[in-house]
Amino acid sequence: RRKKKVNMTIVKEILSWTVEILVTLVIAFTFVYFIGLRTSVVGQSMSETLESGDEILVNRFIYKVSDPKPNDIIVFLPNGNEKSHYYVKRVIAVPGDTVLIQNGAVYVNGELFDEKVDVSAIEEAGLASEELKLEDDEYFVLGDNRNNSEDSRYANIGNVKKDYIIGKAWFRVSPWKKFGFI
């Protein structure tokens, strides 16, 4: 009997393709697991930054290695309610800070908050009409559309605990004309 000669070039090519496919699958899985949460913005509370129906990607990994910072746009479940839709708001104050809304403006630790976007004067200060001190795991959040937002000023949302934060909104995938980093 004759032994069939195996063409080593073909074997190497098959192995190379197999390794490339496996690496691609691992990268894709990692991306989807840590960063790939896609959600829709519901309502006008983040207008002009984000509009109702915008599709965004959420980085679920970043807050496992760092903490939210002022002006980060976060995605969270109100009061940890898993049956609720995701809320998208801007972080105004972080644990240990004090917050006060007075004469339509936001003060953090006695200083006027440095707004990164144009916002209207706040008509309803809610819970922040008196100085609030945030606990070790609490964040004060507001929508960019200050007078049309259900946020930390109201008892049904209140301060957001870190455990309720899903991640950081970082990329808009839809609509195409606004495609890009947030």
Segments (PLM) and residue ranges:
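Beta-strand-rich cores of mature extracytoplasmic or soluble domains
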Residues: L132-I182
